[in-house]
């Protein structure tokens, strides 16, 4: 029977999510990839245990995560909970999302309707064997559904006890501001927007979302902080055959030209001067943004989780380092 590491909370740092009372680890684990039914169960279980032993308490899922079919990541995570992690449920923040296509017909496609969101969460809870999730997100803005309906659905989910907090994902600053006004009127515990952000993807800065979120007490949970794995040492010298780009599993390979390799190599030199790997530097860089609560990492094996979680040991940057990084990114 699994017993968690007694010093796990000494290995991680935590931050309040916006102005809420919920503390999240600065590094969280996402289950988008490598937790489907085509993956090895023992490796999945080892990754969850390794993360928890490192003080990672936030586990991020969605109804459509996993392959070969939607929902398999939730099913496998639920099995891990039952097999070994159930004694630690109250020490975990479990989140799931709904918004993308999930089942046939008009009620299971991309939308933010009350029917879809509530039905989807019920299915997710059943797959994971849970009575509630800690955070339930609307996964993507839906222009065809009134925001009032989406907000009211999320509010009623909290009031029904099926979620403790609500969040949104992939909402722009304008969209976030609009729905947050409704949540304030309803007194809904809306605490977080989950968005993509990295050294190579800085749209939230141009959009103003990060400044708005910080000023208005909304946390930001960042996914793809390594830009689909491009911000790692593995691609500097070429494309390994066993990598996601090598297997043709990501569109990001189209951006890996000679100019990008030179940029990655220059960033890797700065990382080395700090005693970090490129991936650790990239994660630390995201976390230096005061609006960011947590970075959500993916992994294919436990060692990757331990390596990337170590980014929290070096979150400070000198002015010279910031200037050098900005110069490289501007090339």
Question: What positions do the PLM features span?
Answer:
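Active-site groove signature of glycoside hydrolases
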Residues: 125-145
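N-terminal small/glycine-rich loop or linker at the start of catalytic domains
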Residues: 18-36, 95-109, 132, 137
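Short loop/turn motifs at secondary-structure junctions
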Residues: 23, 52-55, 129-132, 162, ...
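Hydrophobic faces of well-ordered beta-strands that scaffold small-molecule active sites
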Residues: 25-29, 59-61, 92-96, 133-138, ...
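Short, acidic/polar
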Residues: 38-52, 112-128, 176-180
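Beta/alpha (TIM)-barrel catalytic core signal, keyed to glycine-rich beta->alpha loops juxtaposed to Asp/Glu
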Residues: 2-11, 143-331
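N-terminal binding-site loop/beta-alpha segment at the start of enzyme catalytic domains
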Residues: 1-92
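Alpha-helix N-cap and loop-to-helix initiation/capping positions
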Residues: 39-46, 69-72, 76, 108-116, ...
């Amino acid at each position: 029977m699994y017993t968690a590491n007694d010093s796990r909370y000494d290995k991680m740092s935590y931050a309040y999510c916006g102005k809420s009372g919920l503390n999240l680890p600065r590094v969280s684990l996402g289950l988008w990839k490598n937790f489907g039914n085509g993956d090895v169960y023992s490796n999945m279980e080892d990754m969850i245990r390794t993360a928890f032993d490192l003080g990672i308490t936030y586990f991020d899922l969605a109804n459509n995560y996993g392959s070969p079919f939607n929902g398999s990541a939730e099913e496998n995570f639920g099995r891990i909970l039952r097999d070994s992690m159930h004694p630690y449920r109250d020490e975990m923040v479990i989140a799931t999302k709904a918004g993308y296509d999930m089942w046939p017909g008009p009620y299971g496609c991309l939308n933010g309707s009350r029917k879809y969101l509530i039905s989807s969460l019920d299915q997710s809870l059943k797959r994971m064997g849970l009575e509630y999730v800690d955070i339930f997100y609307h996964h993507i803005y839906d222009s065809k559904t009134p925001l009032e309906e989406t907000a009211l659905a999320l509010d009623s989910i909290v009031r029904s006890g099926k979620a403790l907090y609500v969040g949104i994902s992939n909402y722009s600053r304008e969209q976030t501001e609009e729905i947050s006004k409704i949540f304030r009127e309803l007194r809904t515990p809306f605490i977080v927007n989950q968005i993509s952000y990295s050294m190579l993807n800085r749209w939230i800065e141009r959009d103003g979302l990060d400044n708005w979120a910080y000023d208005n007490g909304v946390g930001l949970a960042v996914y793809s902080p390594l830009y689909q794995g491009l911000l790692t040492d593995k691609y500097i010298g070429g494309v390994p055959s066993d990598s996601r780009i090598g297997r043709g599993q990501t569109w990001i390979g189209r951006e890996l030209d000679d100019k990008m390799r030179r940029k990655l190599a220059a960033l890797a030199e700065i990382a080395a001067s700090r005693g970090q790997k490129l991936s650790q530097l990239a994660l630390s860089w995201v976390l230096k943004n005061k609006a960011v609560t947590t970075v959500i990492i993916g992994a294919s094996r436990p060692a990757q989780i331990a390596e990337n979680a170590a980014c929290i040991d070096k979150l400070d940057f000198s002015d010279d380092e910031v200037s050098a990084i900005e110069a490289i990114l501007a090339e």
